[in-house]
């Protein structure tokens, strides 16, 4: 079929085909969920985390951070997320409060570290850690094979 046809492509053409194939798989244009699982094989998860879920997770993390702020700081937060000029008006109030700047820095750093830890675990859970050496090595293998001997679209789809 379409996915099993051997193609020999290099450079930009390979990148275009990979974007096309991966885009179709990720957006669901090419197949249904069961077919995605069959194409990608049982070793990889075919479930995709939509960006709307990412936004909800970010909002939830922000709300949890706000909930854990000292009452004095929470009282200064506006109803909606402030823009940069709006934040500037709170700087004098923070400096005059009895909350030490060092304490505030500790709270902020702790929240940032927690957020980074959570984001890495989410990426691992969804097999989306695109920065891993294994993923980079796999991509290099795909380009070498497709350019030198040819490969199937299914082989390219497995690297998405």
From Swiss-Prot:
Main location group: secreted
Entry superkingdom: Eukaryota
Single GO cellular component term: extracellular region
Pfam families: Insulin
Keyword annotations of the record: Cleavage on pair of basic residues, Disulfide bond, Hormone, Secreted
CDD domains to which the protein is assigned, alphabetical: IlGF_relaxin_like (cd04365)
Tissue expression: Expressed in the endometrium during pregnancy and in mammary gland during lactation.
Cysteines engaged in disulfide bonds, as pairs: 10-147, 22-160, 146-151
Compartment(s) of residence: Secreted
Propeptide intervals in chain numbering: 34-133
Record flagged with keyword Lyase: no
InterPro entries found in the cross-reference section: Insulin-like, Insulin-like_sf, Insulin_CS, Relaxin, Repro_Hormone_Insulin-like
SUPFAM superfamilies, sorted: Insulin-like
GO molecular function, one term: hormone activity
UniProt cross-references to PROSITE patterns, sorted A to Z: INSULIN (PS00262)
PANTHER family referenced in this protein's UniProt entry, alphabetically: PRORELAXIN H2 (PTHR12004:SF13), RELAXIN (PTHR12004)
Protein family according to the UniProt entry: Belongs to the insulin family.
Function noted in UniProt: Relaxin is an ovarian hormone that acts with estrogen to produce dilatation of the birth canal in many mammals. It bears mature young, and allows separation of the pelvic bones.
Complex formation: Heterodimer of a B chain and an A chain linked by two disulfide bonds.
Name of this protein: Prorelaxin
Source species of the chain: Cavia porcellus (Guinea pig)
Taxonomic placement: Eukaryota, Metazoa, Chordata, Craniata, Vertebrata
Record gene name: RLN
